[in-house]
Design a protein with these regions (language model features):
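Active-site neighborhoods and metal-handling regions in enzymes and metal-associated proteins
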Residues: 1-256
């Protein structure tokens, strides 16, 4: 009997709340609001639907979600920064329900963006989905990284090396690390019941990053734009399940 079915059921609930939070934010993110307001909306939605926001007070983080604008790679801290026409922003949400975690992120474009920006965002989303679609028992973690890296580098972009996907279930971050670059047929073998994130961070320029003095915010070293998408997934007997799919069918910009 599949002893992970109960875990998967709880992961579905947490993942669904995280996805619905992003769906709500998709309909509210626009020029003129602050990233603090985005954080407030996310916090209240998760709270009002029976969960709590995992990032809040995690290792001293003081906000409920991450808002990473333009050349910020990840872990941007919500602030009084006002969103403007032409900005791109990644919003990363992690909801906890019944001690299980659902972690997902999505890119947003404010107003008109250039062809290069759109190509970067499209490639980032497509690289994540290409990796997801090959998931099944017996696959190796290196196959995931290879799928993303080979696709992205053909597009002329680069894969961030300093951050990766991770195991997730009743803990926010747990083994294994899921690298977004790698060699085919290398690393840990996937088995039914495993749950983890795939969350490629892709830069328009070089992959090098630097950390800001706040200890959280990672930015591209060359100030090129960065993009990211993320899903929480489980390995089934024959393939995979995405726990954080949009309820409203929002995948990548433009959403509305």
């Amino acid at each position: 009997m599949n002893n992970y079915l109960e875990k998967f059921e709880k992961m579905r609930v947490a993942g669904n709340l995280a996805a619905r939070t992003l769906d709500m934010l998709t309909e509210n993110i626009k020029p003129g609001i602050t990233t603090d307001y985005v954080d407030k909306l996310g916090y209240e939605f998760i709270r009002d639907h029976g969960g709590y926001s995992a990032p809040l007070y995690y290792r001293g983080f003081k906000k409920s979600l991450c808002t990473s604008l333009n050349h910020v790679v990840c872990h941007g801290i919500p602030s009084d920064r006002v969103l403007s026409e032409g900005d791109t922003i990644n919003v990363d949400v992690t909801a906890v329900v019944d001690k299980h975690y659902g972690d997902t992120s999505r890119m947003f474009c404010l107003g008109e963006t250039s062809v290069k920006v759109n190509n970067l965002i499209d490639a980032t989303y497509e690289s994540m989905m290409k990796a997801i679609k090959i998931l099944k028992p017996g696959l190796k973690l290196g196959d995931i990284g290879y799928e993303i890296q080979s696709f992205i580098e053909k597009k002329g972009f680069s894969v961030v090396r300093d951050f990766c996907g991770h195991g997730i279930s009743t803990t926010f971050h747990e083994p294994p690390n899921v690298l977004h670059y790698g060699r085919k047929d290398s690393g840990m073998e996937l088995k039914p019941g495993m749950t983890f994130t795939i969350e490629p961070m892709i830069n328009a320029g070089k992959w090098d990053i630097k950390m800001l003095n706040d200890g959280w915010t990672a930015v591209t070293k060359d100030k090129s734009l960065s993009a990211q998408f993320e899903h929480t997934l489980g390995i089934t007997e024959n393939g995979y399940e995405i726990f954080t799919e949009s309820v409203k069918g929002y995948t990548k910009p433009p959403y509305l």
